[in-house]
């Protein structure tokens, strides 16, 4: 494995640091789930409080972030009228709070006893936070127990890097089935789909011949197996997904709400489609309970695949615009690039960036463009961050041929033998020290 650091000096005095990492085989690259970080709830609340809300306080209301501790003792309804039969206690809790609580003057106002009991139990275990913008609305934001620190996972690994997009801002939480910290977008390893493709975005795929390519993929392209039943969109089932649809219509037959590789809920009622998944409607009756595992077929020849951001290079040619689909989940307006709340300019908007791709020999290459500190940035002292156009130039100069963006911004980091050679862009509001963001999913070369 080879790693090099480059510093680019611009005429206006700004600088940009870049790390390029190369290794031999895609088979060495695996997906990694960090151990849960106990303080993840506080970190996400701080991200809302320090970065998201100050950027546009007029579009945020009162946001209630909460987690369920493992030993949580409050009984939660598994069957809800509005959201169907749910598999997850976190989803059930979100439904209770959504139906029964609002926030005024940073304090809860309860509409029923179930919501009050749940809120007080979460308070006793220090598992609920309120972050407020200027609007009078209330948004319930469940936080999974998945996110952890990449620096604390697999400390002996040769390489670690963040990877997938995950539900993070409140507008990503489009339904009670969407939880902060849930990864989404295709992840496939040795033919097994870990997370399905969504939104028909571009994916980097490496087949068993070690040939890399980039192509658009959606969940409708795959065959879906649940409890021995095989479903294909347009053949014996209908799939409803965003951004084309906000709701699945409901009816006499049951709908399956799916996130990742699980049936999250089963419902006969009109159902809000999750941003992190989709809704499947079998044309024939099938007894499939909530919690059933989901298997995806159609990518068995793929050694490694990932679907995150827009392509950067295709067949050695720079991507000059946005080829993947992104949208503002709040109004379903097309936007050029994530985050879904703040549209970004392809040529001018700079941030920390991570790119993964293959060189002309098909070997993996990783590139990190260090981002500007979100608090306390001094031009010429720290990196300014890269636009997507600049990222394409950097990747081309590094000899990459097929390349996609991974999750960037405050999540972006590479660790070699558990050492970070560049700086992450999130900063502690008091000390200005680097502040690592919890993430649910990463990549590792052991």
Which residues fall in each region the model found?
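Gly/Ser/Thr/Pro-rich low-complexity, intrinsically disordered segments
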Residues: 1-446
């Amino acid at each position: 494995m080879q790693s090099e650091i480059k510093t680019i000096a611009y005429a206006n005095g700004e600088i940009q640091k870049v790390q390029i990492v190369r290794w031999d085989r895609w088979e060495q690259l695996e997906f990694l789930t960090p151990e849960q970080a106990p303080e993840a709830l506080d970190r996400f609340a701080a991200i809302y409080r320090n970065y998201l809300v100050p950027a546009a306080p007029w579009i945020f209301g009162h946001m209630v972030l909460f987690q369920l501790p493992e030993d949580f003792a409050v009984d939660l309804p598994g069957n809800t009228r509005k959201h169907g039969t749910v598999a997850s206690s976190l989803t059930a809790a979100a439904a209770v709070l959504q139906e029964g609580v609002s926030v005024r003057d940073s304090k809860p106002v309860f509409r029923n006893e179930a919501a009050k009991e749940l809120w007080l139990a979460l308070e006793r275990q220090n598992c609920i936070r309120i972050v407020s913008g200027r609007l009078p609305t209330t948004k319930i934001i469940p936080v999974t127990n998945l996110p952890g620190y990449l620096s604390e996972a697999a400390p002996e690994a040769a390489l670690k890097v963040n990877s997938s997009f995950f539900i993070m801002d409140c507008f990503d939480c489009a339904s009670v089935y969407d939880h902060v910290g849930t990864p989404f977008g295709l992840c496939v390893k040795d033919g097994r789909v870990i997370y399905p493709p969504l939104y028909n975005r571009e994916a980097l795929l490496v087949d068993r011949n070690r040939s890399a390519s980039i192509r658009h993929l959606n969940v409708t392209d795959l065959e879906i197996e649940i409890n021995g039943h095989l479903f294909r969109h347009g053949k014996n089932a209908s799939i409803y997904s965003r951004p084309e649809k906000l709701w699945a219509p409901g009816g006499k037959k049951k709908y399956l709400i799916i996130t990742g590789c699980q049936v999250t809920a089963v419902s006969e009622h009109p159902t809000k489609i999750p941003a992190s998944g989709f809704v499947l409607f079998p044309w024939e009756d099938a007894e499939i309970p909530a919690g059933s595992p989901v298997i995806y077929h159609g990518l068995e020849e793929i050694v490694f695949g990932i679907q995150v951001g827009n392509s950067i290079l295709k067949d050695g040619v720079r991507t000059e615009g946005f080829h993947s689909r992104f949208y503002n989940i709040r109004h379903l307006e097309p936007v050029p690039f994530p985050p879904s709340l703040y549209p970004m300019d392809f040529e001018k908007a700079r941030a920390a960036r991570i790119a993964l791709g293959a060189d002309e020999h098909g070997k993996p290459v990783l590139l990190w463009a260090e981002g500007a500190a979100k608090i306390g940035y001094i031009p010429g002292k720290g990196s300014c961050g890269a636009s997507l156009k600049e990222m394409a130039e950097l990747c081309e100069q590094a000899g990459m041929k097929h390349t996609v963006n991974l999750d960037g911004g405050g999540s972006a980091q590479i660790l070699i033998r558990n050492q970070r050679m560049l700086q992450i862009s999130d900063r502690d509001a008091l000390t200005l020290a680097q502040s690592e963001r919890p993430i649910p999913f990463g990549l590792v070369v052991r």
